Structure formats: C-alpha cells, structure tokens
C-alpha cells in the first residue's frame, strides 16, 4: 500500500505456505491498483471498504475462484476487464452511484447468472458481459448508451429488456452474437431496434 493505493496483493502468507482464500482490504485504502489481484486463483472472497473510490483496470483479472463481490458505495466505474475471467463469480452487488461499466468488465464470468443494475448506470461498454452465464437481463432505466457485443457468447441468455432512457446502441447491428437460446426482447413502444437477431426471437413492447 502506497499513498492509500493498494498496488499489489501479496498472495502468499504464513511463511509462503498457505494461500489465503478471503481478503479484507483495510479501511483507508482509496484505490485498488491495476492488476493488483490478477491471477489470485485461490481467492474466493474479497471485502472492499467504502473508503475505496476507484478500482483500476484488470484489478481482479482471472481470479477464477472468486465467488462474490460487493462494490463500495463511492465507486462510480467498473474499469476495463476488472473482473474478467472470474469464472466462478456468482454474486455481484452494485452500488447506487455506479455510472459506467467499461469494456470486458465481467467477460468470461461463466457462473454469473443474474445481476441487478442500479438506475444510476448511464453507460455499459462493449463486450462487458460477453461469455457469461446470464439468463435474464433487465437493463436499468437511466441507461443511455450500450456498446457492441455486450452479450456475445451468452449461451444461456433467454430474455433482455431495454429501458426507455436508452439513446444509443453502438452495436453496428450486433449485440446478441452467439446467443442461441435468446427467446424474447422487450422494448419500449416506438423503439426502433436496428439489430441482427434470430427469427425465432419474439419482440414485445411496453408503454
């Protein structure tokens, strides 16, 4: 830790004999550095204090046994590939101040079946939830931008609901590549969905 920034987690404790499965970051740390926990394959749970306001790119990249994460209340962005490759991540608790989910943030989180998005989110960037276990997604009211291939490779994805607030789908037509089980897309009435999807997908509209 330097200047309240956790730069790197030293994964081995007890004279380098026993890997630690749960880590509690001390209160007072304000930032988690880039790749700080990268490849900590033994880590199952990390407790992040509310003093943390920034989690940098790839901070938890390939922590393959990480099961749960609760985002501190003052973090406004999930950075590039922050939790990418956390294939056993099942529980993600987001806060009410989160504004942006960056590229590849949760890519390859195979066990992630559901996520509750707060209405504070304005932007979800491309590839952010590709190759996850998501089954049903309700995008939050307040969301304005969604990037391309966000749900690419989500083989279990069955249903997606878009909010009235959405202004830009920067997907060049593609948002649901490799989503063979997609059955339903729910849209606000009058919304023009210029996307490529299978003919078997039903479109529903709401007021």
Q: What is the role of each PLM region?
A:
Residues 1-5, 17-31, 41-54, 64-77, ...:
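Structural signature of tandem-repeat unit edges
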Residues 9-17:
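Eukaryote-biased recognition of intrinsically disordered, low-complexity regulatory segments
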Residues 10, 168-169:
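Short regulatory "switch" loops immediately downstream of catalytic or recognition motifs
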Residues 14, 33-36, 56-59, 79-82, ...:
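Consensus positions within tandem repeat domains that build extended binding/scaffold surfaces
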Residues 129, 196:
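Soluble or luminal CAZymes and related metallo-dependent hydrolases
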